[in-house]
From Swiss-Prot:
Residue sites binding ATP per the record: 104-111
Species for this entry: Gibberella zeae (strain ATCC MYA-4620 / CBS 123657 / FGSC 9075 / NRRL 31084 / PH-1) (Wheat head blight fungus)
EC number: 3.6.4.13
Entry function: ATP-dependent rRNA helicase required for pre-ribosomal RNA processing. Involved in the maturation of the 35S-pre-rRNA and to its cleavage to mature 18S rRNA.
GO MF: ATP binding; ATP hydrolysis activity; RNA binding; RNA helicase activity
Keyword ATP-binding on entry: yes
Gene3D superfamilies named among the record's database cross-references: P-loop containing nucleotide triphosphate hydrolases (3.40.50.300)
Gene Ontology BP annotations: rRNA processing
Name this protein carries in UniProt: ATP-dependent rRNA helicase RRP3
C-alpha cells in the first residue's frame, strides 16, 4: 500500500438502509493523580508536592541552572524554552560533579538532562573520547547521537554512533578520528574495544547508561562488565531510567560514587494524568476485528500497535495494509536500515500506524503519538508502563487501549494492581464492531498467504529481513544482543 495516510474502512451496511451516524459516548476526562509519596533520603531529590507547586513561581531557565551561554543558545535554537522537571533537578547536581541516578518517565527530557552537563564539562576541558553513552537498542543510540550533535552544533562537537548491524570498518574510521562523544550499543562497543587498533577509553571522563534497567538485563550483563573494565575509575557516571531495579542498585554499589538519586516520579508504576487508559474484554478469535474497529475509530491519528512477537507484528501490519491503512512494522528481525526507515516514515507522518514489538517501547524519540493499542498485553507491568508512555508526552493528552482476552486475565489484573486503579472499559457496540467482520476475514486470508514467504525467509539461518546481511551459521553474536527480538 503506497498511500501515505490511513483512510476509514467502509463498514458492511445492509442494502436499502442508511448508515447510522455513530455518536461516541462521552468519555470521562482523565483526572490528575492525587497520590503523592515522599521518600526521606539525604541524597534524593523528589518532585515537589502539590502544595509546593501550587504557589506561582517564575519558571527557571537553562541559564538559571548554570548552563553556559553557548549551550543555552543551542537549546533556544532547538526550541527548548524551559527545562523539564528531570532537567531542572539533575543538571545543577551534575554541574557540581556528582554521580547521578535519574528516574523519570520516557519522554521527560532525559537525554538533554545528561547531555548538557557533559557538553559543558567538555567545553571547559576539551579532549577526545570525553564521554561514552550506552544504549540498549540501535535506534535509541542513533537518537541520542543526533541529540548530542544538535546540542553541540555551536561548539564543533564530534560524535560517533557505534551500533551492531552495520559495517565495522566505517565505525573504526570514525573512532580513529577521535570523537568527543561515543554513543554505542554494548555488544558492538566490546567488538571495537577488542579488535579496533588504537581505540581506547583510558581518557574517558563521563559514562552514561540510558535505559539502565534494560542495559542490565541478562543479555547485556557480560558486555557491561567488560566495558567497565576498559573505563577509568576516576570518572563521572550517570544512570538514567524510567524505573529502578535490584540490578541498578547493585551497579550503583559497584560503579557509582556517592550518587544523588534524582526522581520526578514518586510511584514506580505511575502514568501521567493526561493519559486516558481503557481496556476491551473480548473473545480471542475476535482480536483482529476489534483492532480494526479501534483503528477506524481513531483514523488519522498517530498510532502505535504493540504486539508480542515478530511474527504477529508482521502479520498485523499486512492485515492493516490490506485494509487500506498506512501501517509499517518495526521489529528486531528487520535490517538496521529498514528499522530506521520505518521510524522515519512514522515520525514524518508518511505512515501513521507503527506496528511494533517492544523494541519501540523504550526511549525512542517519537514526538507525537496520539494512541497506543496493546494488541497483545505485555508480560509485566513495567513493560506496560513503557508502552503507554509513548503517548501523552510533554503535557499532551493521549489514549491507551488494551485488548484483553480470556487468556490475559491474570496479566491484566497484575497490571491494574501495579497501577493502583481499575481501568474503564472502552465503550463499543457489538453491531458496529462486527460490521467489519467480512472484510477482516478476507484480509486475514491474504495475510496468511503473505506470511508463508515471511516464515520461509525467517527460517533461514542468520537471516535478516529486507536487505539485511545474515551471518553464516546460527551462532548468536553480540550484534544479536543489540537486537531485542530474534
Amino acid at each position: 500500500m503506497n498511500g501515505a495516510k490511513r483512510r476509514k474502512v467502509a463498514q458492511d451496511t445492509p442494502r436499502n438502509t442508511k448508515p447510522v451516524a455513530q455518536e461516541k459516548p462521552a468519555r470521562a476526562e482523565p483526572k490528575p493523580s492525587s497520590d503523592e509519596e515522599s521518600e526521606e533520603e539525604s541524597a534524593t531529590l523528589e518532585e515537589p508536592s502539590a502544595e509546593e507547586t501550587a504557589v506561582d513561581a517564575p519558571k527557571k531557565t537553562f541559564k538559571d541552572l548554570g548552563v553556559n551561554d553557548a549551550l543555552c543558545e543551542a537549546c533556544e535554537k532547538l526550541n527548548y524554552k524551559y527545562p523539564t522537571p528531570i532537567q531542572e533537578k539533575s543538571i545543577p547536581v551534575a554541574l557540581q560533579g556528582r554521580d547521578i541516578i535519574g528516574l523519570a518517565e520516557t519522554g521527560s527530557g532525559k537525554t538533554a538532562a545528561f547531555a548538557l552537563p557533559v557538553l559543558q564539562a567538555l567545553l571547559d576541558k576539551p579532549q577526545p573520547l570525553f564521554g561514552l553513552v550506552l544504549a540498549p537498542t540501535r535506534e535509541l543510540a542513533t537518537q541520542i547521537g543526533q541529540a548530542f550533535e544538535a546540542l553541540g552544533s555551536l561548539i564543533s562537537l564530534r560524535c560517533a554512533v557505534i551500533v551492531g548491524g552495520l559495517d565495522m570498518v566505517p565505525q573504526a574510521i570514525a573512532l580513529g578520528k577521535k570523537p568527543h562523544i561515543v554513543v554505542a550499543t554494548p555488544g558492538r562497543l566490546v567488538d571495537h574495544l577488542e579488535k579496533t587498533k588504537g581505540f581506547s577509553l583510558r581518557t574517558l571522563k563521563y559514562l552514561i547508561m540510558d535505559e539502565a534497567d534494560r542495559l542490565l538485563d541478562m543479555d547485556f550483563g557480560p558486555s557491561i562488565d567488560k566495558i567497565l573494565k576498559f573505563v577509568p575509575r576516576e570518572r563521572r557516571t550517570y544512570l538514567f531510567s524510567a524505573t529502578i531495579s535490584s540490578k541498578i542498585e547493585s551497579l550503583q554499589r559497584a560503579s557509582l560514587r556517592d550518587p544523588v538519586k534524582v526522581s520526578i516520579s514518586s510511584n514506580k508504576y505511575q502514568t501521567v494524568s493526561t493519559l486516558l487508559q481503557n481496556y476491551l474484554f473480548i473473545p480471542h478469535p475476535q482480536k483482529d476485528v476489534h483492532l480494526i474497529y479501534l483503528i477506524n475509530e481513531h483514523a488519522g491519528q498517530s498510532t502505535i500497535v504493540f504486539t508480542r512477537t515478530v511474527w504477529e507484528t508482521q502479520r498485523v501490519s499486512i492485515l492493516l495494509r490490506t485494509l487500506g491503512f498506512g501501517a509499517i512494522p518495526l521489529h528486531g528481525q528487520l535490517s538496521q536500515s529498514s528499522r530506521l526507515g520505518a521510524l522515519n516514515k512514522f515520525r514524518s507522518g508518511t505512515r501513521d500506524i507503527l506496528v511494533a514489538t517492544d523494541v519501540a517501547a523504550r526511549g525512542l524519540d517519537i514526538p507525537s503519538v496520539d494512541v497506543v493499542l496493546n494488541y497483545d498485553l505485555p508480560q509485566d507491568s513495567k513493560t506496560y508502563i513503557h508502552r503507554v508512555g509513548r503517548t501523552a508526552r510533554a503535557g499532551k493528552s493521549g489514549v491507551a487501549i488494551s485488548l484483553v482476552t480470556q487468556y490475559d486475565l491474570e496479566i491484566y489484573l497484575r497490571i491494574e494492581a501495579a497501577l493502583g486503579k481499575k481501568l474503564a472499559e472502552y465503550p463499543t457496540e457489538k453491531e458496529e464492531v462486527m460490521a467489519f467482520q467480512s472484510r477482516v476475514e478476507e484480509a486475514q486470508r491474504i495475510a496468511r498467504i503473505e506470511m508463508k514467504s515471511f516464515t520461509e525467509e525467517r527460517g533461514k539461518k542468520g537471516s535478516t529481513l529486507k536487505g539485511g546481511r545474515g551471518k553464516k551459521g546460527g551462532k548468536r553474536g553480540r550484534d544479536d544482543m543489540d537486537r531485542e527480538e530474534g
